[in-house]
């Protein structure tokens, strides 16, 4: 068997954005292009079990169905990327035809109200007419930047209607609001939104609105006093999962509600205590998906349970589990009553599956390149966590494993913290297993998939979660004697980066560390992160009025105790965990005489490891692997 390599990234294909109409199942395919250092996006069709590629445009950005026979998608206009071209594609065959041009960049098609009226999403940036405007930013509202968007002063995204007959674009129908989820029902548009007050506001203040495109009227239906996760509809109700944050703050699992269009009131359908959607981490799921979908009048949804996804339905007011899946369900829909989904099994990348009459079958074979590769299967290890409960972790064994030899190992810590690790294919982990490492990972206290109580890490960062990770490490070393306890490294990103920082400032049991897009100082994080004020108050159970507590939970407080050689990976446009967090740790280790370095990626965001430029993702893996090789194997690499 051949090893997994870093450059395998360029052979992987990624899938998502699945939508259905009639018997047609359409989804997006993406693949990294090494020469252009970007990703190429095109549309795929599955009909009657046969898969074909619909487009060869390389940059399809959004699409929707006009009807069962016709698809629309958007592209930047070829000769003027400040405009968006709409293309109309017959699904029975034939060439796509450029049908409309909108004098705005990045326009997204959301849906058709009727054959002549389209619902669009457009972002507007106010024009700065001052000379050399590109040389500065004017910040007068908060948040002033957002990860993945850059500086957002004055930028607003609104819904518009485009009339194909008159070739006219309406005024924004969401003016004065910050729209979120939406649904088109019976010729009307229903959406959830917060008021646009030009400043931060509570997550738990969304209202429901109705827009009538015939009367051109917008009606405020009700203030939910909640944060909505989706918006679907049956015959006479709007259905949505929502949280009021009263359980465990921002990370509270949502409950299922219905808004009666007749009675104008909200009813609780299910006091759901689990999470909504797929929160299993991977670096091989580039495209987005959906957590809910209607099958006629039946609402279906996915949920993460410990380390995998299950599918449920709501028939009337009753919940039923309709599929227990061993891996992940990234995107799904129904075509003529048959479930189709893009998912991944343990140790595998994404494929297209269908479930008919209770039987699941795989339709696609997207990844023949992995058939001759060594894929380490995740072996379960149970340990007793900080909550005195039995918890599940996993170990990947190195390629060509010899039980009579000793091997280095890497503890990998997920982000979130309210996400999970599962057993699906994870490129970085499989790479290290192919390169001769044990890789071990778990879901410490604060992770998703085990209810609100287990996820409630508020005010406890670096305590029970740290204890879990140390107990898990102890258990792994006891049960896998082939791991050399003197050659164990640790890495993680985001929350995993915070934990890596916490670990190196509280123990020297790890001989190398790679801290990625991390948090090191909750006091400065409050003022520099795009989500700082609300996230700090929520996750630390206090704000700046209690600086002593924020400082106690900051790895910088104990930086003088750190001895572990540590690599820092950060991006200069990461506004979620800003680069100053890494700078503080870097300076602290340098002052202490600890071996360290930072690799800073320009024009990358918090998403570097998942959707960063392909060449940058390659360099990131090289840097971490070389750092571990140097300190755990004694292998020298060129700088």
For the regions a protein language model found, what residue spans apply to each?
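Asp-box/WD-like beta-propeller blade repeats and closely related beta-sheet repeat scaffolds
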Residues: 82-156
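Short loop/turn segments that connect beta-strands within beta-propeller blades
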Residues: 47-49, 90-94, 163-167, 212-216, ...
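Short, solvent-exposed loop/turn segments at conserved positions within beta-propeller repeat blades
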Residues: 35-40, 78-83, 150-156, 199-206, ...
């Amino acid at each position: 068997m051949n090893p997994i390599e870093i450059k395998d990234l360029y052979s992987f294909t990624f899938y998502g954005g699945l939508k259905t109409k009639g018997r047609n199942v359409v989804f997006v395919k993406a693949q990294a292009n090494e020469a252009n250092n970007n990703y190429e996006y095109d549309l795929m069709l599955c009909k009657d079990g046969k898969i074909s590629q619909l487009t060869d445009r390389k940059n399809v950005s959004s699409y929707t169905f006009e009807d069962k026979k016709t698809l629309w998608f958007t592209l930047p206009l070829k000769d003027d990327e400040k405009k968006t071209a709409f293309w109309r594609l017959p699904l029975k065959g034939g060439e796509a035809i450029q049908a409309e041009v909108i004098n705005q960049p990045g326009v997204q098609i959301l849906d058709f109200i009727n054959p002549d009226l389209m619902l669009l999403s457009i972002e507007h940036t106010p024009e700065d007419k001052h000379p050399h405007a590109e040389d500065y930013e004017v910040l007068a509202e908060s948040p002033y930047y957002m990860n993945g968007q850059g500086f957002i002063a004055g930028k607003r995204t609104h819904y518009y209607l485009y009339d194909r007959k008159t070739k006219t674009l309406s005024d924004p129908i969401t003016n004065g609001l910050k729209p979120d989820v939406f649904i088109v029902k019976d010729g009307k548009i229903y959406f959830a939104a917060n008021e646009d007050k030009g400043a931060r506001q509570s997550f738990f203040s969304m209202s429901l609105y109705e827009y009538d495109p015939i009367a051109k009227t917008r009606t405020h239906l009700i203030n939910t006093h909640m944060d909505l996760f989706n918006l679907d509809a049956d015959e006479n109700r709007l259905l949505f999962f929502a949280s009021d944050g009263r359980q465990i703050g921002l990370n509270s699992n949502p409950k299922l509600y219905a808004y009666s269009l007749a009675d104008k009131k909200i009813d609780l359908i299910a006091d759901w205590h689990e999470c909504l959607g797929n929160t299993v981490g991977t670096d091989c799921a580039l495209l987005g998906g959906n957590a809910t979908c209607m099958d006629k009048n039946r609402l279906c949804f996915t949920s993460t349970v410990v380390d995998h996804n299950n599918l449920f339905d709501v028939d009337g007011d009753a919940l039923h589990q309709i599929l227990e899946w061993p891996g992940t369900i990234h995107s799904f829909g129904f075509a003529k009553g048959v479930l189709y989904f893009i998912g991944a099994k343990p140790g595998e990348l994404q494929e297209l599956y269908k479930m008919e009459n209770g039987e699941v079958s795989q339709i696609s074979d997207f990844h023949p390149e992995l058939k001759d590769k060594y894929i380490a299967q995740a072996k379960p290890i149970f340990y007793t966590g900080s909550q005195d409960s039995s918890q599940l972790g996993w170990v990947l064994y190195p390629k060509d494993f010899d039980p009579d030899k000793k091997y280095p190992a890497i503890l990998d810590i997920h982000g979130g913290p309210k996400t999970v690790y599962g057993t699906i294919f994870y490129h970085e982990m499989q790479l290290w297993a192919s390169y001769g490492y044990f890789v071990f990972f778990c879901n410490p206290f604060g992770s998703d998939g085990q209810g609100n109580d287990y996820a409630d890490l508020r005010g406890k960062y670096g305590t029970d979660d740290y204890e879990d990770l140390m107990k898990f490490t102890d258990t792994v070393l006891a049960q896998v004697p082939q791991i050399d306890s003197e050659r164990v490294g640790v890495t993680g990103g985001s929350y995993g980066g915070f934990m890596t920082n916490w670990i190196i400032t509280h123990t020297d049991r790890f001989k190398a560390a790679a801290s990625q897009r991390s948090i090191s100082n909750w006091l400065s994080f409050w003022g520099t992160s795009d989500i700082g004020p609300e996230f700090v108050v929520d996750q630390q159970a206090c704000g700046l009025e209690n600086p002593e507590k924020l400082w106690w939970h900051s790895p910088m407080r104990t930086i003088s105790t750190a001895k572990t050689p540590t690599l820092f990976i950060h991006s200069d446009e990461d506004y979620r965990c800003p680069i100053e967090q890494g700078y503080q740790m870097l300076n602290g280790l340098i002052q202490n005489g600890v071996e360290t370095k930072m690799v800073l990626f320009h024009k990358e965001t918090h998403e570097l490891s998942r959707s960063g430029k392909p060449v940058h993702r390659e360099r990131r893996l090289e840097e971490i692997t070389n750092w571990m090789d140097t300190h755990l194997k004694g292998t020298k690499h060129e700088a």
